[in-house]
C-alpha cells in the first residue's frame, strides 16, 4: 500500500503507539458488548513469493486461493476496487471457500468512489452489488474507501450516497483526507452519522499517516 508509505530510513522517528480511546466512543458505541470474533486476512492471495513459504512448494496459481483459506479466514478483496466482477467469476471464488468460515470483504469499485460525483453512480453501484452478491454466505463487510482528496466539504454528498446503499448489508467506510481527523467535531459528526446507519469505519495503521490510526 502506497498510502502513508515513508522512506525506511525515517521509520525510527515514527511513534507507532496507539492513541487513547476517546470519550465519545461511549456515545457512538452504546449498548451491551457482543460476542468477540476476529477475522484475519491480507489484501490478496496471489503472491508467488509465498510458494514454498506460506503455500506448499510447487503450488500452482490456480490453487493459491485454496491454500490461502487454509491460513486465514478473511480477505480485503482489493481486486473489486479495480474492476467490477460478474457473478460467474465471484461464484468461482465462493465455491473454493465452500464449507469454511471464510469472509470475502470486497472493496467498492474505485470508478464509483474516486471518479466524479457520487450522485451519478447508480448504474455502476448496481453492477458492483450484482457481482458481489454471488459470494452468498461468504460475503463479509464491504469496504468503501474515499480518496485523499475527498474531504469534509463533500460530507453531504457522501452521506446521501451511503444512505442509498442496501440496509441489509454491512459496510465499513475509510476516509483519508486530513481534514476528517484534524477537527474533533467533524470526525465525531462523521462517526455519529455512520453509527446511525449501522456502518463501521476503517482504522488505518500506516507510518506516514498516524492520524488515520484513530480508536
Language model features with spans:
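Residues lining hydrophobic/aromatic ligand-binding pockets adjacent to catalytic sites
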Residues: 1-215
